Amino acid sequence: MVLMILPIIGSVSASEGLVAMVTLCLVYMIMKYMHTEIPEGLKRLPGPKPLPIIGNMLEVHNNPHLSLTAMSERYGSVFQIQIGMRPVVVLSGNETVRQALIKQGEDFAGRSDLYSFKFINDGKSLAFSTDKAGVWRARRKLAMSALRSFATLEGTTPEYSCALEEHVLKEGEYLVKQLTSVMDVSGSFDPFRHIVVSVANVICGMCFGRRYSHDDQELLGLVNMSDEFGQVVGSGNPADFIPILRYLPNRTMKRFMDINDRFNNFVQKIVSEHYESYDKDNIRDITDSLIDHCEDRKLDENANIQVSDEKIVGIVNDLFGAGFDTISTALSWAVVYLVAYPETQERLHQELKEKVGMIRTPRLSDKINLPLLEAFILEIFRHSSFLPFTIPHCTIKDTSLNGYFIPKDTCVFINQWQVNHDPELWKEPSSFNPDRFLSADGTELNKLEGEKVLVFGMGKRRCIGEAIGRNEVYLFLAILLQRLRFQEKPGHPLDMTPEYGLTMKHKRCQLKASMRPWGQEE
């Protein structure tokens, strides 16, 4: 982000008019800050002193989760920085984050009015929108209802317990065949390249009721758009924090808007096709479920806010995003960790062999009997912390936290990485150790420890895709562990240094996989 903004600042200084406007804005911000009245009994937020115009951007380097963690060690779990001309409160520490998002959840339930957010789903995004509480709550309730219908375990059947299980099991089988086929031809494979396509197929099946071949150009186009979106968002948009830059040519922002337009048009086309073929007695997927809601003209029972047909596109767009990049990143990290810790990989396979066997495919109903696998997934979430921050929150009224005054409309960052690596919360936090989530005898999952891991956010803005995420990662991973053994490619050592972006991904690598004796007991 810093590297992007410095050349822009140079171009701004070349124009006297723009310099004057920036100066006026700066003077206004300083005067506003200096005249912010602190209620009696409360304290002013601590934090580093900002520089003119750019604030503390030079101190927030290319790995902001690390630099902000270092600042929290100096200033505490609640402190303020200035990014450009926007004050930002940074929250760290498990207790502080829980206090803000759960106990004082209403105060911190807003979304910051960042400029770029207006272009995500044409400003109708459930996750990014600054809509009033009644509006986003009504749409969130609708989205959660659709997800529960298709993505959660509501009792087993001879076939599949839910649509998610059906889609993942079929796609998992195909992924195993793909990896073994690639191994036969090339002798190694790129885990992210194949996993991301499989995960995209699952969410397409859930949302759109269609499955693509892995070389389908429409599917690959979706995958590429998601990758572009992550790159652009991860690089940051200076106009979010220096308002005057909105009026200057911005190649990155133009690319960001183009990606959103392309994906919105794709989803709009799918939704229109669903309207044409909609059958109330045959709800095929999540899009049909949302249309069914709008056809029945159901109202939010609290706010009486009707969800219009146009909002369906935004909700489907959000659900696709919630069920795609996060899950593919988690699964790709999981395979890399299996290679990095081969003894853990063998323990996981042994657990599956004993509890599920080598004849049938693992199911969602097996999850309760696979505590080590669940612990492994939790430790991947914690150790990699591939979602280092939540989407920025915003205070909806003047409030206080830990004795510090926080004004209304303040942008709030939640440092999930710090919580997941806090030495006060975890023993040897830098060590990868799934056993930290197991009981002393290793037979049960310690759910209280698992609840400390922060990956999907918490409180009123908790990720709506969490149910999909946890179950999908579990099912895919169980199938892969049961069928395949993963190894490092000789001469290609793993580099697990994360690359910062919307989600932190591992460096692309080449791995090896070999079939286990599937279909017969070892």
From Swiss-Prot:
Induction and repression of expression: By 3-methylcholanthrene (3MC).
Localization of this protein: Endoplasmic reticulum membrane; Microsome membrane
Family membership noted in the UniProt record: Belongs to the cytochrome P450 family.
CDD domains to which the protein is assigned, alphabetical: CYP1A
The keyword Acyltransferase is annotated on this UniProt entry: no
Keywords recorded for this protein, A-Z: Endoplasmic reticulum, Heme, Iron, Membrane, Metal-binding, Microsome, Monooxygenase, Oxidoreductase
Record-linked Pfam families: p450 (PF00067)
Name by which UniProt lists this protein: Cytochrome P450 1A3
Alphabetical GO biological process terms: hormone biosynthetic process; progesterone metabolic process; response to polycyclic arene
Catalytic activity field: an organic molecule + reduced [NADPH--hemoprotein reductase] + O2 = an alcohol + oxidized [NADPH--hemoprotein reductase] + H2O + H(+)
Known role: Cytochromes P450 are a group of heme-thiolate monooxygenases. They oxidize a variety of structurally unrelated compounds, including steroids, fatty acids, and xenobiotics.
GO molecular function annotation: catalytic activity; heme binding; iron ion binding; steroid 17-alpha-monooxygenase activity
Enzyme class, first EC level, given as a word: oxidoreductase
Residues at which heme binds: 463
Enzyme Commission number(s) of this protein: 1.14.14.1
Native source organism of the sequence: Oncorhynchus mykiss (Rainbow trout)
Residues bound to substrate: 229
GO cellular component: basal plasma membrane; cytoplasm; endoplasmic reticulum membrane; heterochromatin; microvillus membrane; nuclear membrane; perinuclear region of cytoplasm; rough endoplasmic reticulum
Cofactor names: heme
Matches recorded under SUPFAM superfamilies: Cytochrome P450
